[in-house]
Amino acid sequence: MADAPTRATTSRVDSDLDAQSPAADLVRVYLNGIGKTALLNAAGEVELAKRIEAGLYAEHLLETRKRLGENRKRDLAAVVRDGEAARRHLLEANLRLVVSLAKRYTGRGMPLLDLIQEGNLGLIRAMEKFDYTKGFKFSTYATWWIRQAITRGMADQSRTIRLPVHLVEQVNKLARIKREMHQHLGREATDEELAAESGIPIDKINDLLEHSRDPVSLDMPVGSEEEAPLGDFIEDAEAMSAENAVIAELLHTDIRSVLATLDEREHQVIRLRFGLDDGQPRTLDQIGKLFGLSRERVRQIERDVMSKLRHGERADRLRSYAS
Protein backbone atom coordinates (compact mmCIF):
# COMPACT_ATOMS: atom_id res chain seq x y z
CA MET A 1 0.00 0.00 0.00
CA ALA A 2 2.83 2.41 0.81
CA ASP A 3 5.32 1.42 -1.91
CA ALA A 4 3.33 2.37 -5.00
CA PRO A 5 2.61 6.01 -3.98
CA THR A 6 6.24 6.39 -2.92
CA ARG A 7 7.55 5.19 -6.28
CA ALA A 8 5.18 7.58 -8.04
CA THR A 9 6.26 10.47 -5.84
CA THR A 10 9.93 9.62 -6.35
CA SER A 11 9.40 9.56 -10.10
CA ARG A 12 7.76 12.99 -10.07
CA VAL A 13 10.54 14.45 -7.94
CA ASP A 14 13.21 12.91 -10.19
CA SER A 15 11.71 14.73 -13.15
CA ASP A 16 12.34 18.05 -11.38
CA LEU A 17 15.90 17.30 -10.23
CA ASP A 18 19.17 16.59 -11.95
CA ALA A 19 19.38 12.80 -11.61
CA GLN A 20 23.08 13.04 -10.71
CA SER A 21 22.79 15.89 -8.21
CA PRO A 22 23.38 15.44 -4.46
CA ALA A 23 19.96 17.02 -3.86
CA ALA A 24 18.27 14.31 -5.91
CA ASP A 25 20.10 11.62 -3.94
CA LEU A 26 19.01 13.16 -0.63
CA VAL A 27 15.40 13.39 -1.73
CA ARG A 28 15.40 9.76 -2.89
CA VAL A 29 16.81 8.62 0.44
CA TYR A 30 14.15 10.64 2.28
CA LEU A 31 11.31 9.29 0.12
CA ASN A 32 12.49 5.71 0.49
CA GLY A 33 12.49 6.17 4.26
CA ILE A 34 9.01 7.67 4.56
CA GLY A 35 7.53 5.11 2.18
CA LYS A 36 7.78 2.39 4.80
CA THR A 37 4.70 3.66 6.67
CA ALA A 38 1.36 2.68 5.13
CA LEU A 39 -1.15 5.35 4.20
CA LEU A 40 -4.12 5.77 6.54
CA ASN A 41 -7.84 5.74 5.90
CA ALA A 42 -10.21 7.98 7.87
CA ALA A 43 -10.91 5.30 10.49
CA GLY A 44 -7.19 4.76 11.04
CA GLU A 45 -6.65 8.49 11.53
CA VAL A 46 -9.42 8.66 14.13
CA GLU A 47 -8.03 5.64 16.00
CA LEU A 48 -4.58 7.24 16.19
CA ALA A 49 -6.05 10.60 17.20
CA LYS A 50 -7.90 8.95 20.09
CA ARG A 51 -4.70 7.27 21.29
CA ILE A 52 -2.85 10.59 21.08
CA GLU A 53 -5.61 12.27 23.10
CA ALA A 54 -5.50 9.51 25.72
CA GLY A 55 -1.73 9.84 25.98
CA LEU A 56 -1.92 13.59 26.50
CA TYR A 57 -4.56 13.16 29.20
CA ALA A 58 -2.47 10.48 30.93
CA GLU A 59 0.54 12.79 30.83
CA HIS A 60 -1.57 15.56 32.38
CA LEU A 61 -2.63 13.24 35.21
CA LEU A 62 0.96 12.22 35.90
CA GLU A 63 2.00 15.86 36.11
CA THR A 64 -0.88 17.13 38.24
CA ARG A 65 -1.97 14.24 40.50
CA LYS A 66 0.45 13.89 43.39
CA ARG A 67 -1.07 10.88 45.15
CA LEU A 68 -1.05 8.22 42.48
CA GLY A 69 -0.12 4.66 43.39
CA GLU A 70 2.79 2.96 41.65
CA ASN A 71 0.52 0.67 39.64
CA ARG A 72 -1.55 3.63 38.48
CA LYS A 73 1.59 5.52 37.51
CA ARG A 74 2.84 2.55 35.48
CA ASP A 75 -0.50 2.25 33.70
CA LEU A 76 -0.57 5.96 32.88
CA ALA A 77 3.04 5.88 31.70
CA ALA A 78 2.12 3.04 29.33
CA VAL A 79 -0.75 5.12 27.93
CA VAL A 80 1.63 8.06 27.45
CA ARG A 81 4.06 5.85 25.51
CA ASP A 82 1.24 4.51 23.37
CA GLY A 83 0.09 8.06 22.62
CA GLU A 84 3.60 9.02 21.57
CA ALA A 85 3.78 5.98 19.29
CA ALA A 86 0.44 6.93 17.74
CA ARG A 87 1.69 10.47 17.21
CA ARG A 88 4.79 9.20 15.38
CA HIS A 89 2.62 6.90 13.27
CA LEU A 90 0.25 9.71 12.24
CA LEU A 91 3.21 11.96 11.45
CA GLU A 92 5.09 9.37 9.40
CA ALA A 93 1.97 8.35 7.48
CA ASN A 94 1.54 11.93 6.25
CA LEU A 95 5.13 12.81 5.34
CA ARG A 96 4.45 11.95 1.71
CA LEU A 97 1.67 14.54 1.73
CA VAL A 98 4.25 17.14 2.74
CA VAL A 99 6.53 16.12 -0.14
CA SER A 100 3.64 16.29 -2.60
CA LEU A 101 2.73 19.83 -1.49
CA ALA A 102 6.34 21.03 -1.19
CA LYS A 103 7.04 19.96 -4.77
CA ARG A 104 4.51 22.54 -6.02
CA TYR A 105 6.70 25.36 -4.70
CA THR A 106 10.00 24.28 -6.29
CA GLY A 107 11.75 26.64 -8.66
CA ARG A 108 11.14 29.70 -6.46
CA GLY A 109 14.60 29.91 -4.92
CA MET A 110 14.15 27.50 -2.02
CA PRO A 111 15.60 23.95 -2.21
CA LEU A 112 13.08 21.10 -2.13
CA LEU A 113 14.49 19.65 1.09
CA ASP A 114 14.09 23.03 2.80
CA LEU A 115 10.50 23.26 1.55
CA ILE A 116 9.87 19.77 2.95
CA GLN A 117 11.35 20.76 6.32
CA GLU A 118 9.06 23.81 6.51
CA GLY A 119 6.09 21.68 5.49
CA ASN A 120 6.89 19.16 8.21
CA LEU A 121 6.60 21.96 10.78
CA GLY A 122 3.13 22.69 9.41
CA LEU A 123 2.24 19.01 9.67
CA ILE A 124 3.27 18.99 13.34
CA ARG A 125 1.14 22.09 13.95
CA ALA A 126 -1.83 20.40 12.27
CA MET A 127 -1.44 17.41 14.58
CA GLU A 128 -1.55 19.73 17.59
CA LYS A 129 -4.74 21.45 16.38
CA PHE A 130 -6.62 18.48 14.90
CA ASP A 131 -9.99 17.63 16.47
CA TYR A 132 -11.17 14.25 15.21
CA THR A 133 -14.67 14.80 16.66
CA LYS A 134 -15.44 17.33 13.92
CA GLY A 135 -15.40 14.60 11.31
CA PHE A 136 -12.67 15.99 9.04
CA LYS A 137 -10.08 13.71 7.48
CA PHE A 138 -6.71 14.59 8.98
CA SER A 139 -4.82 14.67 5.68
CA THR A 140 -7.34 17.17 4.29
CA TYR A 141 -7.14 19.28 7.44
CA ALA A 142 -3.33 19.17 7.48
CA THR A 143 -3.02 20.39 3.89
CA TRP A 144 -3.89 23.97 4.91
CA TRP A 145 -1.32 24.04 7.71
CA ILE A 146 1.41 22.54 5.52
CA ARG A 147 0.84 25.10 2.77
CA GLN A 148 0.86 27.94 5.29
CA ALA A 149 4.14 26.76 6.81
CA ILE A 150 5.79 26.46 3.39
CA THR A 151 4.72 29.92 2.23
CA ARG A 152 5.91 31.44 5.50
CA GLY A 153 9.25 29.72 5.09
CA MET A 154 9.50 31.15 1.57
CA ALA A 155 8.70 34.60 2.93
CA ASP A 156 11.40 34.30 5.58
CA GLN A 157 13.96 33.32 2.97
CA SER A 158 12.96 36.16 0.64
CA ARG A 159 13.69 38.65 3.42
CA THR A 160 17.34 37.63 3.34
CA ILE A 161 17.95 38.16 -0.38
CA ARG A 162 19.61 41.55 0.06
CA LEU A 163 21.76 40.50 3.03
CA PRO A 164 25.48 39.76 2.83
CA VAL A 165 26.04 36.08 2.10
CA HIS A 166 27.70 35.40 5.46
CA LEU A 167 24.54 36.54 7.31
CA VAL A 168 21.96 34.66 5.25
CA GLU A 169 22.69 31.25 6.77
CA GLN A 170 22.50 32.55 10.35
CA VAL A 171 19.28 34.49 9.73
CA ASN A 172 17.61 31.45 8.15
CA LYS A 173 18.80 29.21 10.99
CA LEU A 174 17.48 31.59 13.64
CA ALA A 175 14.13 32.02 11.87
CA ARG A 176 13.64 28.26 11.72
CA ILE A 177 14.60 27.77 15.38
CA LYS A 178 12.27 30.58 16.37
CA ARG A 179 9.33 28.87 14.63
CA GLU A 180 10.18 25.48 16.10
CA MET A 181 10.41 26.90 19.63
CA HIS A 182 7.13 28.76 19.21
CA GLN A 183 5.40 25.49 18.32
CA HIS A 184 7.07 23.64 21.20
CA LEU A 185 6.54 26.32 23.86
CA GLY A 186 3.21 27.68 22.66
CA ARG A 187 4.64 31.23 22.82
CA GLU A 188 7.41 33.35 21.37
CA ALA A 189 10.85 32.33 22.63
CA THR A 190 12.87 34.94 24.53
CA ASP A 191 16.20 36.16 23.18
CA GLU A 192 17.94 34.18 25.92
CA GLU A 193 16.13 30.96 24.91
CA LEU A 194 16.96 31.55 21.26
CA ALA A 195 20.61 32.08 22.10
CA ALA A 196 20.77 28.89 24.16
CA GLU A 197 19.07 26.81 21.48
CA SER A 198 20.94 28.23 18.48
CA GLY A 199 24.39 28.70 20.01
CA ILE A 200 24.42 32.27 18.71
CA PRO A 201 25.66 34.91 21.20
CA ILE A 202 22.76 36.82 22.70
CA ASP A 203 24.19 40.20 21.66
CA LYS A 204 23.97 39.02 18.05
CA ILE A 205 20.41 37.69 18.32
CA ASN A 206 18.82 41.15 18.15
CA ASP A 207 20.86 42.11 15.09
CA LEU A 208 19.86 38.94 13.26
CA LEU A 209 16.20 39.38 14.20
CA GLU A 210 16.29 42.91 12.81
CA HIS A 211 17.77 41.62 9.56
CA SER A 212 15.04 39.01 9.34
CA ARG A 213 12.40 41.76 9.50
CA ASP A 214 13.51 43.38 6.25
CA PRO A 215 10.45 44.05 4.06
CA VAL A 216 9.20 41.51 1.53
CA SER A 217 6.72 42.19 -1.24
CA LEU A 218 3.27 40.94 -0.31
CA ASP A 219 2.51 40.77 -4.03
CA MET A 220 4.98 37.91 -4.58
CA PRO A 221 2.96 35.16 -6.31
CA VAL A 222 2.82 31.81 -4.54
CA GLY A 223 0.98 28.58 -5.12
CA SER A 224 1.15 25.87 -7.74
CA GLU A 225 -0.40 28.17 -10.35
CA GLU A 226 0.87 31.45 -8.88
CA GLU A 227 -2.78 32.35 -8.43
CA ALA A 228 -2.50 34.21 -5.12
CA PRO A 229 -0.16 36.83 -3.64
CA LEU A 230 1.89 36.04 -0.56
CA GLY A 231 -0.12 38.61 1.41
CA ASP A 232 -3.13 36.31 1.23
CA PHE A 233 -1.26 33.83 3.44
CA ILE A 234 -0.03 36.27 6.11
CA GLU A 235 -2.01 36.44 9.33
CA ASP A 236 -3.36 39.74 10.61
CA ALA A 237 -5.36 40.64 13.68
CA GLU A 238 -8.62 41.07 11.76
CA ALA A 239 -8.37 37.94 9.63
CA MET A 240 -10.45 34.86 10.41
CA SER A 241 -8.73 32.41 12.71
CA ALA A 242 -6.69 29.61 11.20
CA GLU A 243 -9.25 27.11 12.46
CA ASN A 244 -12.07 28.95 10.70
CA ALA A 245 -9.99 29.25 7.53
CA VAL A 246 -9.46 25.49 7.47
CA ILE A 247 -13.14 24.82 8.08
CA ALA A 248 -14.16 27.29 5.36
CA GLU A 249 -11.88 25.58 2.86
CA LEU A 250 -13.18 22.14 3.80
CA LEU A 251 -16.78 23.37 3.57
CA HIS A 252 -16.15 24.79 0.10
CA THR A 253 -14.67 21.46 -1.00
CA ASP A 254 -17.59 19.46 0.42
CA ILE A 255 -20.16 21.80 -1.17
CA ARG A 256 -18.52 21.25 -4.56
CA SER A 257 -18.60 17.49 -4.02
CA VAL A 258 -22.26 17.50 -2.98
CA LEU A 259 -23.32 19.68 -5.91
CA ALA A 260 -21.49 17.35 -8.28
CA THR A 261 -24.07 14.66 -7.37
CA LEU A 262 -26.88 16.78 -8.88
CA ASP A 263 -27.78 16.79 -12.54
CA GLU A 264 -26.04 19.42 -14.67
CA ARG A 265 -28.88 21.96 -14.79
CA GLU A 266 -29.57 21.73 -11.06
CA HIS A 267 -25.86 22.14 -10.42
CA GLN A 268 -25.56 25.27 -12.57
CA VAL A 269 -28.74 26.87 -11.20
CA ILE A 270 -27.56 26.55 -7.59
CA ARG A 271 -24.04 27.80 -8.38
CA LEU A 272 -25.51 30.89 -10.04
CA ARG A 273 -28.29 31.43 -7.51
CA PHE A 274 -25.85 31.56 -4.58
CA GLY A 275 -22.88 33.07 -6.41
CA LEU A 276 -20.61 30.14 -5.57
CA ASP A 277 -18.17 30.92 -8.38
CA ASP A 278 -17.79 34.69 -8.13
CA GLY A 279 -19.60 35.74 -4.94
CA GLN A 280 -22.42 37.43 -6.90
CA PRO A 281 -25.82 35.72 -6.51
CA ARG A 282 -28.11 35.90 -9.57
CA THR A 283 -31.82 36.60 -9.47
CA LEU A 284 -34.41 34.08 -10.62
CA ASP A 285 -35.03 36.22 -13.71
CA GLN A 286 -31.33 36.36 -14.63
CA ILE A 287 -30.96 32.59 -14.33
CA GLY A 288 -34.17 32.03 -16.28
CA LYS A 289 -32.87 34.09 -19.20
CA LEU A 290 -29.59 32.14 -19.25
CA PHE A 291 -31.36 28.77 -19.46
CA GLY A 292 -34.49 29.80 -21.35
CA LEU A 293 -36.68 29.00 -18.35
CA SER A 294 -39.48 30.84 -16.62
CA ARG A 295 -38.89 32.51 -13.29
CA GLU A 296 -41.20 30.01 -11.59
CA ARG A 297 -39.40 27.04 -13.15
CA VAL A 298 -36.08 28.27 -11.77
CA ARG A 299 -37.70 28.71 -8.35
CA GLN A 300 -39.00 25.12 -8.55
CA ILE A 301 -35.52 23.78 -9.41
CA GLU A 302 -34.04 25.70 -6.49
CA ARG A 303 -36.71 24.36 -4.12
CA ASP A 304 -36.19 20.78 -5.31
CA VAL A 305 -32.42 21.00 -4.87
CA MET A 306 -32.68 22.48 -1.39
CA SER A 307 -35.02 19.64 -0.43
CA LYS A 308 -32.45 17.11 -1.66
CA LEU A 309 -29.68 18.81 0.30
CA ARG A 310 -31.66 18.61 3.55
CA HIS A 311 -31.96 14.83 3.50
CA GLY A 312 -29.86 11.71 3.15
CA GLU A 313 -26.15 11.40 2.58
CA ARG A 314 -25.81 14.93 1.18
CA ALA A 315 -27.21 16.42 4.39
CA ASP A 316 -25.00 14.19 6.54
CA ARG A 317 -21.92 15.45 4.73
CA LEU A 318 -22.72 19.11 5.39
CA ARG A 319 -24.43 18.86 8.79
CA SER A 320 -21.21 18.99 10.84
CA TYR A 321 -20.54 22.54 9.63
CA ALA A 322 -23.74 23.77 11.26
CA SER A 323 -22.63 22.71 14.76
UniProtKB/Swiss-Prot annotation:
Q: Where is this region: Sigma-70 factor domain-2?
A: 90-160
Record region (Sufficient to interact with RbpA): 1-228
A GO term from the CC aspect: plasma membrane
According to the entry, DNA is bound by residues in: 284-303
For this UniProt record, the keywords arranged alphabetically read as follows: DNA-binding, Sigma factor, Stress response, Transcription, Transcription regulation
In a knockout, what does one observe? Answer: More sensitive to SDS (cell envelope stress) and hypoxic treatment in vitro. No effect in human THP-1 macrophage-like cells, intravenously inoculated BALB/c mice or aerosol-infected Hartley strain guinea pigs.
Segment forming the signal sequence: none
Gene3D superfamilies with a match to the protein in the record:
RNA Polymerase Primary Sigma Factor, Winged helix-like DNA-binding domain superfamily/Winged helix DNA-binding domain
Q: Which family is this protein grouped under?
A: Belongs to the sigma-70 factor family.
Please describe what this protein does: Sigma factors are initiation factors that promote the attachment of RNA polymerase to specific initiation sites and are then released. A non-essential principal sigma factor that responds to cell envelope stress and hypoxia. Controls a regulon of about 40 genes, with another 100 genes expression being altered during SDS stress and about 50 gene being altered during diamide (oxidative) stress.
According to UniProt, the name of this protein is RNA polymerase sigma factor SigB
